[in-house]
Amino acid sequence: RNVALVGHGGSGKTTLLEAALLSTGVISRLGRVEDGNTVSDYDKMEIEKGYSISASVVPVEYKKMKINFIDTPGYFDFVGDVNSALRACESAVILVDAFSGIQVGTEKAWNSCKEYNIPTFFLINKIDKENVDVDKVVTDLQHKFGTSVVMLSEPIEGDVRESLTEAVAESDEELLEKYFGGEEFTDE
């Protein structure tokens, strides 16, 4: 599986990848973009500038599954690398800084994912910052990108389950008929 990490510059794509590498035991110490010691930003210019300039493929094994994460630049001066990465991926994760919310890079990443018809997930990052309102970010994402945006990080029950079911139903005509007919969805 190839998964692109896309989003506005500074949204935390490289840091998320570092956390995945640490969690899976690939690295023993979390690298920091600011310190110039991350796995995916190894180019001299990237280390000097403190941000990704070109896409990097980093394989991660998790539960006997290999995932090739493609860490892409967030600044759209490097959009060619982003588009190349998306063409090689089965899915994409758009990172959104919880404090900053939707930014130009978020919108451009979404548009590129839609252009290549790639299943896309939003990951709201940096939720530990002070004065962050995750519900507002989710609402903003829904207003900007449509009702198919639902929060999955909460237990899938109650209102969240209903929102998820409704969003899935809206994505397919056959599922929509099942939904309005009161039928339960299968796991497929």
Model-derived regions, located:
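P-loop NTPase catalytic nucleotide-binding module
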Residues: 1-11, 29-30, 98-188
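P-loop NTPase switch module centered on the Walker A-proximal segment
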Residues: 1-96, 102, 136, 143-145, ...
